Amino acid sequence: MDDSKRILITKILKNEVTEALGCTEVGLIGYAVSLCNISDPFSIEKIELTLNNGSFKNVYAVGVPNTGKYGLLPAVVGGFLGNSKNKLLIFNDITYSQELEDFTKEKLEIKVINGPLYCSVKIKDNSGKIHESLIKDNHLNVVIPEIKKEKINMEINSSEKEKYKNLELLDFLNYLDEIPEEIIKLVEKTIYTNKNLIKGDFLNYGTDILSNMVNKTTSACNIRMTGENMTAMSVAKSGNMGIMATLPIISYDFSTENNSEKLIKSVLLSMLVTIYSTYNSSYLSSMCGCVSKGGMGAVIGLSHYKNGKNLKKFDSSARTFTANLPGIICDGGKVGCALKLASGCFAAYSSLFVDISYENGIVGKNFKECVENISKISKAMGDLDCDIVEIMSKKEM
């Protein structure tokens, strides 16, 4: 493959495969609050938090690390207690304060808007000074305040995303032939980190390959959604998507060959496809990205592990997956996400053994067309978020 494509793919991977503590949108809020640089939170008179509906959904009922709490309020409080240098690991090593939560609760106003990822924090202190921050479009794109961005974390611009979207599956396969050492280390870290999330049995109903895959994947998701103080390697800014894109393949390797070279290449291919699917749609949407995007990554990764570089098998598996799960809604980050990932595991694994034809519904002719069709449906579901947020907002929590 030519150098320009290799350089682009490497940059994308370094930007889109990152470590996160807790649900990514919880980290987003905490990071945004910490950027306001409030030295004395008890001096606050008013906090205005504005979120896009997708971010609101994902924080509403999810656990916040090192707080023992769930939802928006502890995410804000944790942001006051964390160090902004930790970014999406903002809750690392914090000591939670119930007194600060009680104080903050009376000062917090929340507004939800439509649109892509958006998190604005405006804080007025008792001297009348306004402190503010704004993160938009992706979880690390800080617009306010202006900060010097580290070279390694330079965000991907729209032109680079378009170039990546124009790549073919064959380009990703060619990248596997000569993986840069830094990317091998990144994949190894991802495998190690996400394997460590497997604690206990969330959904254990057997010992066959699929049952093990479901149990390992759902157990990791459950740990993350309950707010355990354990990091996950996120893919395309989503920890659950990272879990869905990696753990089915890691489990399959454990149950079959234990081949580290095949595992690294298959997990890497899954991550590349997951990012590709995300760039074709969006980071957050009304459709469950963990299943539709992380699931498509898992499908192609599993097919690579089982069948090697067989383009016909990739297309067949993508068609079968597209005939199954796309359209499942995203109603926010929560323990129930683990069950959606269980469905994703079943759909991904069964796609290895059945070939659904192009004539079925939204099924495309090949991998690329399947991704495009799923993305089109995802974008068309945009208005659903308003109804989902309305239903969630009426709950007594």
Swiss-Prot record:
Keywords: 4Fe-4S, Iron, Iron-sulfur, Lyase, Metal-binding. Transmembrane segments: none annotated. GO terms for biological process: L-cysteine catabolic process to pyruvate. Its cofactor is [4Fe-4S] cluster. The keyword Metal-binding applies. Its EC number is 4.4.1.28. It comes from the Archaea. It catalyses: L-cysteine + H2O = hydrogen sulfide + pyruvate + NH4(+) + H(+). Coiled coil: none annotated. [4Fe-4S] cluster binds at residues 288, 330, 337. The keyword Repeat does not apply. Catalyzes the cleavage of L-cysteine to form 2-aminoprop-2-enoate and sulfide. The former then spontaneously hydrolyzes to pyruvate and NH(3). May be responsible for the production of sulfide required for the biosynthesis of iron-sulfur centers in this archaea. Homotrimer. This is L-cysteine desulfidase. It comes from Methanococcus maripaludis (strain C5 / ATCC BAA-1333).
